[in-house]
Amino acid sequence: MPVGVLVVALAVAAMTGMWDVSAWHFDRDDLVFVAVASVVPIVAAPLFWGEEFGWTAYLRDRLVPGRPVATTFATGLIWGVWHWPLPWVGYFGAGGTATDAVVAMLMWLPLSVLLEFVIGWLWGRSGSVWPPAILHGGSNLVVAVGIGRFVDPGAHTNTVTLLMCAAYVPVVACIVGASIVSRRRKIGVEQ
């Protein structure tokens, strides 16, 4: 899934003029990135397992029991706020002005909610923390790094986050749409 999300983000970047595809030259490093992009999330999953155990396995279903959409928004918002210190300590969103850091913090909220919809769907379908951990690793190490690599190696973190949000919107729309159709079918069968 992360490779597909990266492709959507790159398409959005190209369509909006954020990425001039004609000026881009595919080199050996790009080939290596593409070759390992599907393996990296799996290899990195143990690094993200602890975070997903806490957010997904422990917090998610306890936060707003029986209300998956409400718990998704609540967990996503808490998760986004949890990451707010990162631009101030040299991680994602660092290197710019204080305004850039604040904007990065605010943009993490919609990104975290969108990711939480996908994570919640994976968790609900699998009952395991591993698929969310794989997605989390892929989102950080394939989607974010890939956007930075292909769109503009010096791309501002907020550009990367905006493109990630744009790429996750259709994924979330498909998940929500499929859930609505499934629920309606279930109701129709029960009647």
Task: Enumerate the predicted regions with their spans.
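Residue-level signature of the transmembrane alpha-helical core
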Residues: 3, 38, 42-46, 73-80, ...
